[in-house]
Regions:
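Basic nucleic-acid-binding interfaces
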Residues: 55-63, 113-117, 122-124
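Short Lys/Arg-enriched helix C-cap and helix-to-coil transition segments
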Residues: 2, 19-39, 152-154
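Short coil turns linking two alpha-helices in DNA-binding domains
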Residues: 7-10, 33
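Long, low-complexity, charged/polar intrinsically disordered regions in eukaryotic proteins
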Residues: 35-100
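Residues in the recognition helix of alpha-helical DNA-binding motifs
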Residues: 3, 10-14, 137-140
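Intrinsically disordered, low-complexity regulatory segments enriched in Ser/Thr/Pro
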Residues: 89-118
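Short, compact, well-ordered microdomains
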Residues: 115-160
Length: 161
């Protein structure tokens, strides 16, 4: 430092940073979470911009294993079934601790179409229609920002948005 006439901070600023691993073969869990979060944000933004069945499907794929809560506060997650050809079947497997339920894609689409017709607050899941599994679809549509719900229900579902 006496040789260069620079301060200690200046000398260290020119040295390469050695504390981090760049372009590692395996990414950290935090990096994976950040990547998933960005993908989910992008899919939801696209769905809000262009509310189509295809964009809904892409959002559904992105939110697999996301911790949702029903309007009554019961936690659940879903996964998509994988078909024989290795692609996703359009069937959601709802994972509720002890029980697993299957939810058809047609039910999700029906609730989605009904949500587009509703402009005011959706007070309860059944307001979207008499649809099988609507209590699980309701928090998903709310999380995607497609419906508004009462504040009391929002608190039970965890204010995730």
């Amino acid at each position: 430092m006496k040789l260069t006439g620079l301060s200690r901070a200046s000398v260290h600023s020119y040295l390469p940073y050695t504390k981090g691993i760049y372009n590692a073969a395996e990414i950290s869990l935090n990096a994976e979470r950040c990547r998933t979060y960005k993908i989910r944000q992008e899919k939801v933004r696209l769905l809000k911009e262009i509310p189509s069945e295809e964009n809904l499907w892409q959002s559904i794929i992105a939110f697999q294993d996301y911790p949702f809560k029903t309007a009554t506060g019961l936690p659940f997650r879903y996964k998509l079934k994988i078909g024989k050809n290795g692609e996703y079947n359009r069937e959601l497997l709802i994972d509720r601790r002890e029980k697993s339920k299957s939810l058809a894609w047609s039910s999700v689409v029906l609730a989605f179409e009904n949500s587009k017709k509703v402009s005011e607050e959706v007070k309860k899941p059944k307001a979207l229609g008499d649809i099988r599994g609507v209590s699980y679809i309701y928090p998903i549509l709310w999380r995607f920002g497609l419906i508004r719900v009462p504040e009391a229900i929002e608190k039970k579902m965890g204010k995730q948005r």
